[in-house]
A protein has these predicted regions:
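Short alpha-helical elements
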Residues: 1-278
Length: 278
C-alpha cells in the first residue's frame, strides 16, 4: 500500500544495509505476507517519536505484529548481529581497524514511568528514581555493549558485567578503557586485572577546575548519550523489562549507524587522537 513517508523511514540505501541480516521465513506454513521493511520503519518511528505501541500509525503493519518481530529479533540475536556488522563498517569507513583498541565507559540515570517493571531504584547522586544505562563505546562513539540496571546500582559495581558483555572473542584488540572518577574503585581494579586484559584509565579533571570540564578522552561517551537523546522513547525508560529497555537503546543506535553509512559521513574526530588511536 502506498503511503506518505515519515522522516524515520529507511531509504533504499539504508534498507540494503539491513536486509541481509533479517532471518528468512521459517520452513513450512503459509508464505510471509508482512513487509519487514515496514516493520523496521514502524520500530524506528516508535523509538524516535516516543509513541506507545498501540499508537503506531495504521499505515504500518499491526502493532502486535511489529512487537512480535521486535521480541523475536531480541531473542535470536538479530539486533546484536546487525549492530556488530554496521559498527565494523563505520570503523572501516573512517579509516580505522574494524575492531577497537580503545573504549570509554559511562552511565546515565533516567526516570521510569508509572507502570513499574524490573530493576528500579534511586540514584542519590543524580536525584533520579528509575534506571541507569551503562554504555561502553569505541573511539568513534559506536556502541560496544549496553547494560541497564536499577539507578541505585553503583557504576563501579555494574562495570564488571558490562565488561563481560564485551567478550574477548568479539573484541580481541580491546586494551584501554577510559572512565571518570565514578569508576575509581579498588575492587573494580582488582576484578579487571584478574579477569580481563584491559587497562582501566581514570580521566581526572584539571586541578583547581570547577564546574563542567570537557575531557577529550571521555567526550566521546557523552556524545553517544546525546545521539541517543534524540530518540524520545529514551527520554524516560518506558519498558517493563530490562531486555526490552536495552533493545530500545540498540535500535536508536542502529538508526544512527545506518544513516551515517548510507550518507557516507564519518563521525568527526575528537581531540588527542595520538592517545586514542584505535
Amino acid at each position: 500500500m502506498e503511503r506518505n513517508p515519515y522522516p524515520t523511514d529507511l531509504t533504499d540505501a539504508q534498507w540494503k544495509l539491513i536486509e541481509p541480516f533479517l532471518p528468512p521465513p521459517l520452513p513450512g506454513g503459509r508464505p510471509r505476507k508482512t513487509d519487514l521493511r515496514e516493520v523496521l520503519n514502524a520500530l524506528l518511528y516508535l523509538v524516535r517519536s516516543g509513541c506507545q505501541w498501540r499508537m503506531i500509525p495504521h499505515e504500518f503493519p499491526p502493532w502486535k505484529t511489529c512487537y512480535n518481530y521486535y521480541r523475536a529479533w531480541i531473542d535470536n540475536g538479530t539486533w546484536d548481529e546487525l549492530a556488530a556488522s554496521l559498527r565494523m563498517d563505520i570503523r572501516c569507513q573512517a579509516g580505522r581497524h574494524e575492531l577497537p583498541k580503545v573504549a570509554a565507559i559511562d552511565s546515565q540515570s533516567v526516570k521510569t514511568t508509572e507502570q513499574g517493571g524490573e530493576e528500579r531504584g534511586y540514584d542519590g547522586g543524580k536525584k533520579v528514581s528509575g534506571r541507569k544505562r551503562h554504555l561502553l563505546v569505541d573511539s568513534l562513539g559506536m556502541l560496544l555493549a549496553v547494560l541497564v540496571t536499577s539507578a541505585a546500582v553503583d557504576d563501579a559495581h555494574a562495570a564488571p558485567e558490562l565488561f563481560a558483555r564485551a567478550e574477548s572473542e568479539a573484541f580481541p584488540r580491546l586494551r584501554t578503557i577510559y572512565a571518570d572518577q565514578k569508576y575509581h574503585n579498588y575492587d573494580l581494579y582488582q576484578w579487571v586485572e584478574a579477569n580481563t586484559d584491559y587497562r582501566l584509565h581514570i580521566v581526572n579533571r584539571p586541578p583547581q577546575q570547577r564546574g563542567f570540564v570537557l575531557l577529550p578522552q571521555r567526550w566521546v561517551a557523552e556524545r553517544t548519550f546525546a545521539w541517543l537523546g534524540r530518540s524520545r522513547r529514551l527520554s524516560k525508560d518506558c519498558e517493563k523489562l530490562i531486555t526490552t529497555s536495552e533493545a530500545m537503546i540498540k535500535i536508536a543506535m542502529l538508526h544512527v549507524m545506518v544513516r551515517r553509512l548510507a550518507t557516507a559521513t564519518p563521525a568527526p574526530e575528537f581531540s588527542y587522537q595520538a592517545k586514542l588511536a584505535a
